[in-house]
Amino acid sequence: MAENRGGHGPGARGGYQKPKDAKRTMLRLMKYISGRKWLLVIVFLCVIASSIASIAGTYLIRPVLNELVGAGTLSDKLGYLAKMLAVMAAVFLFGAVCTYAQSAIMAQLAHRGTNKLRGELFDKMQDLPLSFYDKHPHGELMSRFSNDADYVQQMLEQSIVSVISSSLLFVGIVVVMLFTCAPLFLVTLLVLFGSFFAIRIVGGRSRKLYRQQQKALGEMNGNIQEMIEGLRVVKAFTHEDAAKAQFGELNDAYFDVAKDANFYGTAMMPIVANVMNIGYALTSIVGGLFAFGGMLDLGGLAVYLQYGRQISQPMSQVSQQMTSILSALAGAERIFEIIDMEPEVDEGVVTLVGAHKDANGAITEDRESVHPHTWAWKVPRSSRLTLVPVAIEPDGSPIELGQAVREGGALRMLAPNVDSPDGIWVRAERDGSLTEVKDLAALASHGWAWKYPDSAGESTLHIVRGSVRNVPGEDYCLTELKGAVRLIDVCFSYVPEKPILKHVSVYANPGQKIAFVGSTGAGKTTITNLINRFYEIDSGMITYDGIDVRDIRKDDLRRSLGAVLQDTHLFTGTVMDNIRYGRLNATDEECIAAAKSANAHSFIRRLPDGYNTVVSGDGANLSQGQRQLLAIARAAVADPPVMVLDEATSSIDTRTERHIERGMDALMEGRTVFVIAHRLSTVRNSNCIVVIEHGEIQEKGDHEDLLKQKGRYYKLYTGQNILD
């Protein structure tokens, strides 16, 4: 079901969620527009000037009326009137210019500030772990960029200035009214209390109904989205009538609450206007009596009545804008909640670098090639890893070699990378003793391994495959990237005390194909997510070419891995752009070569504009099979040594399936491959098939071995059980 978007989805603006710390959030938001403080000073001066101009322009009516009704010739009165009209026009024009200036400047500052805010939000979301997205619906996250950011922009652009301007105008009008006739202001004060009471009662009911309207609209929009996305299923099960009935109920519920909300919303202004009209009449009567009694001149009465009509406007504007401000501050808090989150932790120090390998197998770092053919792990000597020479036993286990010196008849092993002319080569046996090695060349097999300390003070050795550069004096060493991946007693849980994987151990040598088979939810995809370090394991170890993946920088680790997922996601852009997404610096020729190897070139050529055909939202104008072929081409252009292939469960025609299988075969050639299998026919040629259920490995072996065991795999293969 679609998530309920009632809280943040598109809807009426009348309801709002109160911010938790309005003052702190407002001060933080102001930093986004305070980069050019002199512009804020100009805005503030313009607000003051426009408020004064509005008050002064109205007050000029008083001397004009008093002059017109006083003694003097008609020509003198007309001359004075013309002069004062020119002054009034200049005052109001000045106020209009100041209002325009403040609006234009605040619009620029608000757009700039919101742009920066959205940028920080997007950047932070790129740095958050996948576990964050597991806990937050996509619609909720999208509302941060749309609704919440829009509310913040409107507040910065209009609401704050409007509240300041209205407050200044209100205070200015009150001061002038008191100056004009203080006793008459008591009547005005009574009217203001009446207006405030009406706004509070009607406005409170209106806000409550608008919140209900927003929730009802969110539920209705969620239903519409769900029905559009699942229209094929609705039609397949002939549930059109049920869908219509369900939407009708939601639509009617929205209509009922919207009707009441609009009634109270539209009733606000007439009620306040009637209260003010009654007050205006009462003020006119009392003011007239004051004028007849000589307490107030005619011009003063006219000005006072005009201010009496104007005083309700700033009150109403402040009330309306405070709702917008509180909505914006609540939205800003939701944005800052994400911005303040801790980014994905990465304590890795090992980096992936291009390398050059000479005829003798020696490697050096290649800093010139854009896309080198050989890659290596660059390991700082300051890390916890230590590269040591080893002898490899017949069972494949490593035994540390090193140089030692005799001290008092006993051997003491020197630190790794310490070359002593008097040193004696020895083996560090498992019982801790040292055995002298007379002739290194006589060892059946020897090489290098990474030495890892463990929590018990012991150490473990992980064999390095491929060439090694270990030059004393250099602050780093290089080991060739080969694609050997090992999961060693791995345990993992998304939620504490609810294990997903239990003591899983899987070994993949370079170039091997490892297939995971099991029911939905068994933990197959979780294993591949752990190899990518999308999540961190609870215990155990995952090594890549003998290096703990936790010691490899995540960006470098993921650059060395490729993935073709069952839910193929394509981005808006051309076919060429989507292939190049695998490696952004790939040339057109490299992208076309990747498409050919993925068996996608033939269908791409038949598209209206070939490789320049624009892919619509998530590849809706392509078939499922075509999207998969593009995903394979995208992985091929990245050319990683290790691949993760999650087979699609969608039904595709036999011909397209053969195209995809050939593309997959070409992509897997010469790489270490992890396959999440949904069709057993595709895993028969795997070096190892791992049957996993409930997070535990039940069986492990090649196709023939597992058939002989006649266990879970045998039942799946012979059709006695269903895979998914």
Where are these regions (language model features)?
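Cytoplasmic coupling helices
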Residues: 2, 104-123, 137, 164-165, ...
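Alpha-helical segments in transporter systems
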Residues: 4, 27-30, 38-63, 84, ...
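Juxtamembrane helix-loop junctions of ABC transporter transmembrane domains
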Residues: 14-22, 45-46, 53-69, 91-138, ...
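Transmembrane helices of ABC transporter permease
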Residues: 35, 39-49, 94, 158-212, ...
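Transmembrane helix-loop-helix hairpins at lipid-water interfaces of multipass membrane proteins
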Residues: 40-98, 178-183, 294-298
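Helix-loop-helix
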Residues: 71-72, 77, 176-190, 260-333, ...
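An intracellular "coupling" helix at the cytosolic face of ABC transporter transmembrane type-1 domains
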Residues: 130-131, 147-156, 160, 164, ...
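ABC-type nucleotide-binding domain
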Residues: 347-348, 355-724
